[in-house]
């Protein structure tokens, strides 16, 4: 099985290092090959300061891309264009401030298998209380007893069957 991980980053070298450290701790079977593509979304190439260190300390292959248009949307599109002709089984999106549990991949693949799912998102734990907790929108009883609907799922912790990306032709998104 081949997995490609996309991490857009914008001037957060320290949290990116922690993210890569946590990915290095993921428990994997020998049959699983992982590569990481980091998309630098800063205009000043701030990532250059830690590039060599990240490569040296990672047990997985790391590739770096640059996207000058600001925003995770543009960075993820740059990634999708880069992997368009690849033969990955799954792709994953993390944010540069994600810290991944060592059992993340095992649990995500188990969920895909048990639920016959093509896309799995995981939980988010916010360490900063100022961050809006969108998960509250999914609660059935939210004080006034309204049910809120959102048209998206969190994209900072998602595993996607790559066949789906090709099937719906996500590569043609203009950025």
Language-model segment annotations:
Residues 67-86:
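Glycine-rich, basic loop-to-helix element that forms the pyrophosphate-binding segment
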Residues 127, 142-160, 175:
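A recurrent flexible, glycine/aromatic-enriched loop bordering the glycosyltransferase active site
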Residues 33-43, 65-66:
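Short beta-strand/loop segment that forms part of the nucleotide-sugar
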């Amino acid at each position: 099985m081949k997995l490609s991980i996309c991490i857009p980053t914008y001037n957060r070298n320290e949290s990116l290092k922690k993210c890569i450290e946590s990915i290095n701790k993921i428990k994997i079977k020998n049959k699983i090959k992982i590569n990481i593509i980091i998309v630098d979304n800063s205009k000043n190439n701030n990532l250059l300061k830690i590039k060599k260190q990240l490569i040296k300390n990672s047990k997985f292959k790391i590739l770096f891309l640059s996207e000058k248009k600001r925003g995770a949307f543009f960075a993820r599109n740059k990634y999708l264009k880069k992997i368009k002709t690849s033969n990955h089984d799954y792709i994953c999106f993390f944010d540069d401030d994600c810290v991944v549990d060592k059992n993340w991949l095992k649990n995500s693949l188990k969920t895909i298998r048990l639920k016959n799912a093509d896309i799995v998102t995981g939980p988010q734990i916010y360490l900063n209380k100022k961050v809006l907790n969108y998960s509250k929108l999914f609660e059935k009883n939210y004080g006034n007893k309204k049910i809120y609907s959102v048209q998206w799922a969190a994209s900072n912790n998602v595993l996607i069957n790559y066949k789906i990306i090709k099937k719906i032709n996500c590569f043609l998104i203009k950025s």
